């Protein structure tokens, strides 16, 4: 069975590069009816935090990238790592090393001064050293000294590294803790991982890991090293480019559907298709069409996709996110129009859900502050007379008539005729009175969504406060 994994370290936030790796791994497993494993690589005890673990889990949940089975934590597998280390020592494939930090520093200085390759010189490799109680030691892996390590990378093609370039790496530190390159191999073997999709910053780790697979007589998985994501300027993606906690995109009003759709096309292609549902991603995804070159993060493209999903999604699919943003700014959605109807009207005017909530606030909050520029521009000496006539005409409408935007628009038009002014002399002051600014959807639709009671109350307030 095809089995992939996403194995983040909880030493920082989950950013878009990590999300894309997780997405590619998840899609490949789903495309092949396989399994997707989530493993938290928390062996760095000093830097790993529960806060970072929670952020990773929250991000994966928000995006809908559900793992199969339990979530694995490396810190709960230390006994297993120690067991395998002892097996390697017993088989002569690893050894105890007593070299002090001072000796290793002197060795490195000597190598650098003489333009030699830096790395461990193998002093303890064949010394058959057995540590005595109280002595400080590490355990090193016996890397092959001859030949090359080669693999056919699913993205980068054939890669070969001479074993002469690799030294005997430490697999157990002096404090007894196992090291990253060793742990991941044991994990991937035990979890039957068949395909490892990860960032190309791991390419240099791969030959070391392959040698450990071989030493443990295990099958070597397929590696697919995905190029990094660059900022719009071609520099390494940083916080100013968007390398922030993926949950910040939620706070900024982006839909998970838009994030996933954007990231799947960032370095992978399927003809000219730009819009993908989750089902379409799963059906189309493969490793062959991952681009070997880095991709640039394009905020405008992400914003365009987000607008598309706000406009085109079924309301049920985005309702939770919409309600989240309305609640975030303190809006009571029970005190206004049906949210589904509102989104259908406002979607064309916004790029994010933050904009949607902010630009729709007057529909739900009666605590509105008039825009001074709009008041100055549209409220004139004659406006009071117009408001009086509007109130008179609106009061005459019954509940059924108020549900028809065309009827409401015609009332505004009729009022303009009655007051012998142009439509703009009525519509714009009316907008200011009922929305606090000069901007809103079509006036008939705005009136319908606000409802008769709100419109009458706000017109009355405007008449008292703006038309003195």
Swiss-Prot record:
Main location: cytoplasm
SUPFAM superfamilies linked: An anticodon-binding domain of class I aminoacyl-tRNA synthetases, Nucleotidylyl transferase
InterPro entries reported for this sequence: aa-tRNA-synth_I_cd-bd, aa-tRNA-synth_I_codon-bd_sub2, aa-tRNA-synth_I_CS, aa_tRNA-synth_I_cd-bd_sf, Glu-tRNA-ligase_bac/mito, Glu/Gln-tRNA-synth, Glu/Gln-tRNA-synth_Ib_cat-dom, GluQ/Sye
EC number: 6.1.1.17
Record-level Gene Ontology MF annotations: ATP binding; glutamate-tRNA ligase activity; tRNA binding; zinc ion binding
Motif placement: 'HIGH' region: 8-18
One term under GO cellular component: cytosol
Subcellular localization: Cytoplasm
Binding-site list for ATP: 239
Pfam family, one: tRNA-synt_1c
Keyword Metal-binding: yes
Cofactor note: Binds 1 zinc ion per subunit.
Positions in coiled-coil regions: none
Top EC group: ligase
Motif 'KMSKS' region, residue numbers: 236-240
Gene Ontology biological process: glutamyl-tRNA aminoacylation
Residues involved in Zn(2+) binding: 97, 99, 124, 126
Keyword Transit peptide (UniProt): no
Requisite cofactors: Zn(2+)
Keywords: Aminoacyl-tRNA synthetase, ATP-binding, Cytoplasm, Ligase, Metal-binding, Nucleotide-binding, Protein biosynthesis, Zinc
Reactions performed catalytically: tRNA(Glu) + L-glutamate + ATP = L-glutamyl-tRNA(Glu) + AMP + diphosphate
Record-linked HAMAP family: Glu_tRNA_synth_type1
Quaternary organization: Monomer.
Similarity comment text for this entry: Belongs to the class-I aminoacyl-tRNA synthetase family. Glutamate--tRNA ligase type 1 subfamily.
Function text: Catalyzes the attachment of glutamate to tRNA(Glu) in a two-step reaction: glutamate is first activated by ATP to form Glu-AMP and then transferred to the acceptor end of tRNA(Glu).
Protein name: Glutamate--tRNA ligase
Organism expressing this protein natively: Francisella tularensis subsp. holarctica (strain LVS)
Highest classification ranks of the organism: Bacteria, Pseudomonadati, Pseudomonadota, Gammaproteobacteria, Thiotrichales
